[in-house]
């Protein structure tokens, strides 16, 4: 992928800014998401809550299912590939989907290497818990970053932690003497020029969305007020008692995140949210956010 193609991919991801991307498992859910105002859908066979509950190896979704969803909506369609599984990514690119998410929600295929995203023309989304992770993924060719909040829990605490960590580390980099940027880049395994770019911008050079544990309009508005550019919602919509209403509510809260009255309106009469899983109760080997490096 040449520089112009990468810049185009970054611009494509910028077009999703301020919007909500929803996980969907079938055509009906995809249409609900589109009608609710989602800017894109993530096509997958099982939402994170089901992946967590059922266990086993989670792989790329059946391509035929992705094709059916792609045919059913006019908004962009994303799909997940396992960390390091570049052949799954090749298949998804051949399907001509709009974005690939190299996702820790699926079982990693490679415990040493992430996908070299510069070998692809399609934009990639990657998760990050901190600035170092984000910049390593961008150096590999990611056009979009998201938090790695603990998916399938309905608990936003980890996404908040990741965003606050990212914000704090960017502030530290901005205030760093230029001669220390080399040390920062070396210690985080990233190109010096990329670290210098972030120092100058005061933010990541790509969009950074919230993901993981977002279940309510208030969760979405919280992440936007913390500085996220948009929101991914996985299990939070279709594991709730009224998916259609909740989908519309989260879209509204994301758009009007700084208007408490609008967020209040969005929060009324939604029915039951998805059940919440306390992070401390999850066995260490089942924590998804620690996958990747």
Curated annotation (Swiss-Prot):
In the presence of PdxT, forms a dodecamer of heterodimers. InterPro entries: Aldolase_TIM (IPR013785), PdxS/SNZ (IPR001852), PdxS/SNZ_N (IPR033755), RibuloseP-bd_barrel (IPR011060). Its EC number is 4.3.3.6. The active site is at residue 80. Signal peptide: none annotated. Disulfide bonds: none annotated. Catalyzes the formation of pyridoxal 5'-phosphate from ribose 5-phosphate (RBP), glyceraldehyde 3-phosphate (G3P) and ammonia. The ammonia is provided by the PdxT subunit. Can also use ribulose 5-phosphate and dihydroxyacetone phosphate as substrates, resulting from enzyme-catalyzed isomerization of RBP and G3P, respectively. It catalyses: aldehydo-D-ribose 5-phosphate + D-glyceraldehyde 3-phosphate + L-glutamine = pyridoxal 5'-phosphate + L-glutamate + phosphate + 3 H2O + H(+). Pathway: Cofactor biosynthesis; pyridoxal 5'-phosphate biosynthesis. CDD domains: pdxS. D-ribose 5-phosphate binds at residues 23, 152, 213, 234-235. Keywords: Lyase, Pyridoxal phosphate, Schiff base. This is Pyridoxal 5'-phosphate synthase subunit PdxS. It is an enzyme of class 4 (lyase). D-glyceraldehyde 3-phosphate binds at residue 164. GO terms for biological process: amino acid metabolic process; pyridoxal phosphate biosynthetic process; pyridoxine biosynthetic process. PANTHER family: PYRIDOXAL 5'-PHOSPHATE SYNTHASE SUBUNIT SNZ1-RELATED. It comes from Syntrophus aciditrophicus (strain SB). It holds the Pfam family SOR_SNZ. One of its GO terms (molecular function) is pyridoxal 5'-phosphate synthase (glutamine hydrolysing) activity.
């Amino acid at each position: 992928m040449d520089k112009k193609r990468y810049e185009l991919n970054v611009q494509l991801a910028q077009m999703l800014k301020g919007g909500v991307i929803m996980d969907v498992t079938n055509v009906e859910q995809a249409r609900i998401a589109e009608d609710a105002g989602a800017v894109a859908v993530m096509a997958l066979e099982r939402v994170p809550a089901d992946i967590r509950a059922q266990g086993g190896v989670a792989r790329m979704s059946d391509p035929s299912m992705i094709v059916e969803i792609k045919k059913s909506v006019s908004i962009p369609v994303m799909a997940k590939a396992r960390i390091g599984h570049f052949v799954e990514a090749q298949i998804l690119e051949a399907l001509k989907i709009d974005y690939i998410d190299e996702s820790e929600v699926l079982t990693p295929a490679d415990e040493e290497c992430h996908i070299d995203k510069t070998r692809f023309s399609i934009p990639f989304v990657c998760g990050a818990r901190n600035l170092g992770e984000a910049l390593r993924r961008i150096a590999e060719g990611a056009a979009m970053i998201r938090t790695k909040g603990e998916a399938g829990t309905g608990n936003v605490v980890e996404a908040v932690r990741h965003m606050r960590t990212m914000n704090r580390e960017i502030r530290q980099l901005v205030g760093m003497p230029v001669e220390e940027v080399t040390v920062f880049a070396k210690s985080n395994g990233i190109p010096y020029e990329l670290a210098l770019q972030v120092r100058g911008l005061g933010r990541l050079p790509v969009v950074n969305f919230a993901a993981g544990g977002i279940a309510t309009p208030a969760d979405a508005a919280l992440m936007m007020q913390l500085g996220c550019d948009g929101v991914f919602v996985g299990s939070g919509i279709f594991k709730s008692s009224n998916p259609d209403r909740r989908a519309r509510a989260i879209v509204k809260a994301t758009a009007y995140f700084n208007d408490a009255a609008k967020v209040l309106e969005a929060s009324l009469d939604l029915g039951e949210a998805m059940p919440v899983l306390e992070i401390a109760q999850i066995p260490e080997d089942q924590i998804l956010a620690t996958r990747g490096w």
